[in-house]
Amino acid sequence: MAQGDDNKQAIGQIIRQEQALIFPSLDENDAFSLGQRIRDIAVKDKLGIAIDISLWDRRLFFAATAGATADNTEWLRRKFNVVRRFHVSTYRLVLEQNREDRMFAPYKALDVADYALAGGGFPIRVSGAGVIGAVIVSGLPQREDHNLVVRAVAEHVGQDPVALALPAA
């Protein structure tokens, strides 16, 4: 199968993820539980990552595991800005934009210092409220960052993570 066909299938699956992974509500306790779930997976699998769960106006959860770097926290910030701007998964945008340089097209006027075209940011969509924040992971290859977030969110909201996962690249 051609790369373009693979991307189209992955984009379709990510759209299904975004439609399925709806929170009934989200408060500080939910954010902590979700963040801890991601951290537990990372510790068990020895993944060096940084994790951020934020609403548009404040951070609710942050953690880093052994192996994460200061660069990972910077990537978190830039991925958050992308989710805030577009209200979709950052990996979906990576595949839709199909750019090697990880920068948005110049006509979008998005500074690379503040916006990263990289997977790992996922919108927090609350039933009846819409997108209110983002869950973000940084430290793995971008598809793995994305899959880790989707797995944890799916488990948190009672969806089947295997059915929603993107296949390995």
Swiss-Prot record:
Cleavable signal peptide: none
One Pfam entry name: HbpS-like
InterPro entries referenced in this protein's UniProt entry, alphabetically: PduO/GlcC-like, PduO/GlcC-like_sf, YBR137W-like
Record Gene3D superfamilies: Haem-degrading domain
Family under the similarity heading: Belongs to the UPF0303 family.
Protein name according to UniProt: UPF0303 protein BAB1_1430
Organism: Brucella abortus (strain 2308)
Lineage, opening ranks: Bacteria, Pseudomonadati, Pseudomonadota, Alphaproteobacteria, Hyphomicrobiales
